[in-house]
């Protein structure tokens, strides 16, 4: 995924000094995806979830906004919450203006790798350079 992020014009960085609890972030203005090396466990599954989540924000940038309409997002979040409510508890920590993009990212982080890559290529195809 990091290679695709770079091809889309986004820098992928690993920080050794993130605030406690922060696993990753995407800074739209700097077009940088940050992975927090000091907080991520040595577990490829966890690293993948964080990378998929932050790559969802890259997809939103490529798409020029939300990836799905609000009604569809509501239905998908409700279905996902029935399977695992945990990823959605943190939404209340965000300003309400961020709920849609963060909910989309949480849905994407739960998808299999192949689907995440396919979505990335779909939404960022115009930005991907050979």
Regions found by a protein language model. Name each.
Residues 7-20, 69-130:
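Metalloprotease/metallohydrolase-associated module, dominated by Zn2+-dependent proteases
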Residues 48, 52, 56, 106-110:
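Non-transmembrane alpha-helical segments in soluble domains
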Residues 55-72:
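Catalytic Zn2+-binding segment of zinc metalloproteases
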Residues 1-5:
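Conserved small/polar residues in nucleotide/adenosyl-binding loops
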């Amino acid at each position: 995924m990091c290679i695709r992020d770079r091809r889309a014009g986004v820098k992928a960085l690993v920080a050794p000094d993130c605030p406690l609890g922060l696993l990753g972030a995407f800074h739209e203005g700097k077009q940088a995806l940050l992975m927090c090396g000091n907080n991520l466990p040595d577990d490829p599954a966890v690293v993948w979830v964080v990378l998929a989540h932050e790559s969802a924000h890259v997809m939103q940038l490529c798409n020029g906004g939300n990836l799905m309409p609000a009604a569809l997002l509501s239905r998908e979040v409700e279905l996902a919450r029935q399977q695992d409510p945990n990823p959605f508890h943190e939404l209340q920590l965000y300003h309400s203006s961020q709920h849609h993009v963060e909910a989309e990212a949480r849905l994407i982080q739960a998808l299999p790798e192949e689907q995440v890559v396919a979505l990335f290529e779909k939404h960022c195809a115009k930005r991907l350079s050979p």
